[in-house]
């Protein structure tokens, strides 16, 4: 079975190989964003208080519960988010956005089958709902069903060509199947659409490493740590890239930064020792 590339051109066969290892570094598995809806509100106490007032004054309004549930979800208050989405769909069983939002909470909490059911319901109600297509694609990717995931990511991109997360997740899918040039193309598009998140830079850097382009990888990981200086994976992966380039100074400095974030990080400890790092010594990182 083959998967078709996103643009007209040759058919891309993706070998269904489990757990592609990338030159001693692990593939990025997270998502840089969480399929935010349009007009999503920031997860601030003031917004929660305001939305709780709206819910109190409109106890039968499913949109009020959906909006508050979205803010709870952004704040990591998953149980409260779930309760609000449950209420929203009980008030309006045809409320596709609430099903999609509840699917996101289920996915974040590892309940992939429940997430899949909610995304399916949302897409039954609106087959062109890009957010639900993206969310379902991520679930399929996590469930190691790459063909289904590929179709959903393509659908999400066809509906919303400006959706950085859809390109990022399709890139992860290509990467997991060792189709690194296609992965690099998708990560590049994601970076062009949103330049303030480290994960696409890390992911593209890993694919560059997999094709032995450590100079390009180091450049991406420079950007990753600039965007997110507290990102442990960015520092560790950057250190490995510079280690492979023979720049022990920057490698040691990057491993040291990783160890400052997590002194027990085994890969960083081993890498720091490999490049002759000494605790308490200062290193140039840039």
Question: Language-model features: where?
Answer:
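N-terminal leader/linker segments that initiate helical-solenoid repeat arrays
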Residues: 2, 6-7, 19-83, 90, ...
């Amino acid at each position: 079975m083959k998967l078709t590339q996103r643009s007209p051109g040759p058919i891309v066969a993706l070998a269904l190989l489990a757990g592609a290892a990338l030159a001693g570094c692990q593939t990025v598995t997270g998502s840089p964003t969480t399929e935010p809806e349009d007009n999503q509100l920031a997860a601030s106490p003031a917004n929660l208080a305001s939305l709780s007032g709206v819910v109190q004054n409109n106890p039968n309004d499913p949109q009020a519960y959906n909006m508050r549930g979205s803010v709870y979800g952004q704040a990591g208050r998953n149980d409260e988010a779930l309760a609000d989405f449950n209420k929203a769909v009980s008030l309006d069983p045809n409320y596709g956005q609430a099903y999609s939002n509840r699917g996101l909470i289920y996915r974040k909490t590892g309940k992939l089958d429940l997430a899949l059911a909610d995304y399916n319901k949302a897409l039954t109600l609106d087959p062109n709902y890009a957010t639900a297509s993206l969310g379902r694609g991520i679930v399929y990717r996590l469930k190691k069903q790459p063909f289904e995931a590929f179709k959903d990511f393509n659908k999400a991109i066809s509906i919303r060509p400006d959706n950085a997360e859809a390109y990022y997740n399709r890139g992860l899918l290509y990467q997991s199947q060792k189709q690194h040039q296609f992965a690099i193309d998708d990560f590049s598009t994601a970076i062009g659409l949103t330049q303030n998140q480290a994960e696409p830079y890390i992911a593209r850097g890993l694919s560059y490493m997999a094709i032995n382009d450590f100079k390009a990888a180091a450049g991406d990981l420079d950007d990753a740590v600039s965007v997110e200086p507290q990102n442990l994976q960015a520092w560790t992966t950057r250190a490995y890239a510079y280690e492979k380039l023979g720049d022990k100074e920057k490698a040691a400095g990057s491993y040291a930064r990783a160890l400052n974030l997590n002194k027990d990080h085994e890969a960083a400890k081993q890498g720091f020792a490999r490049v002759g790092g000494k605790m308490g010594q200062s290193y140039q990182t840039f």
